[in-house]
Structure formats: structure tokens, C-alpha cells
Amino acid sequence: MHKTITVFGSSQPVETDEQYKLAYQLGSLLAKNGFNVCTGGFFGIMEAISKGAVENGREAIGVTVDHWGGAANKFVTKEIKCNTLFERINKLIETGDGYVILQGGTGTLLELAAVWELSNKRLMDNKPIACHSSMWKEITSLMNEQMKLEGRDDGMVKSFNTVGEIISYLVTNTQ
């Protein structure tokens, strides 16, 4: 059984954007390392991840929400439809054996916070959580400082500068 990595990120990037290209590279490398991928199923980073995975022989699960309407991106090989945003977030988290958080906005922030809190409160199995982008590095650094002050585990969420570092971390920590 292949492990699945859930990737969170913006719906805004298009194929010519650096964020899209980085997400495509990540999806490709995840697939080449035997991982299926799971995303929110729509466009932008979600499409790029799915495209990279499918073009390299792996499954791309898309967890969509009826509220926004519209079809999943054409690279999704299995769609899971949810009725609400919170149902969708729960399904994205349940499906993942590890998580990657790429550039995004408030929705991506909500997803990161949900994964982090479930891990922090030991409400889910210990799974790797990897962030990419200077924005997340700043946020996770601030939160880790607070975690230290509270005497909590401050190493749950890791920040990385390259896709290669993320892949190495996931391969090592999803065994």
C-alpha cells in the first residue's frame, strides 16, 4: 500500500508562476518516491501537485467541497466530495500519512493550524508536517517560540527551503 501525502496550498497560481512550477516538481518527486498525493482538488497548487503525481504514475486524490461548485481539476484520479469546509479539512487530514504546506492564504493557514493542533494535542498519530516558503518559516518560528515558553513540543512542524529537503524528510519519517 502506497502512503499518501496531503499537500495544502493556494488555488491562485497558474502554470507560468514559480509557485505552480515548484508544486509540480514536488508532485513529481513525491510520485517518484512512491507517494500518492491528496489535495483540495481544485486549481493552482492543487492542480500542479496532482499533475506532477499523475504524470509519474501515482494517484491524485482531490477532496472538494460542494459549496464552491465547479469540477475537480482534470488530473484528479479519485474525487471525494464534502458538504462543508470543515468536513473537507478533516478528510484531507485523515487521508494524509504526512503533510506539506506550500504558499497560500487564509485557507492554507487554517489547514496548517488544524494539522498542527491535532498533532499538538495528540489527537492524531504522529505524522510529518513540512512547510515551504519564507512566510511559513516566519510563522512556524514564532509559534515554536510560544510552544517552548509553554513547555510543549516545539519541533512538530518543520520548515524547509527546497523540495529535495521536503522529500528526504517525508521519506525518512513515513516509514
Where are these regions (language model features)?
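A charged, well-structured terminal subsegment
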Residues: 98, 151-175
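Short glycine-rich, flexible loops that bind phosphorylated cofactors or substrates
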Residues: 14, 107-109
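Short, acidic/small-residue loops that bind anionic groups at enzyme active sites
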Residues: 64-66, 102, 118-142, 152-155
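Glycine-rich, charge-decorated loop segments at or immediately adjacent to ligand/cofactor-binding or catalytic sites
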Residues: 44-48, 136-147
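Short Gly/Thr/Asp-enriched flexible loops that form oxyanion-binding sites at enzyme active sites
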Residues: 47-53, 110-122
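Acidic/glycine-enriched connector segments
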Residues: 44-102, 107
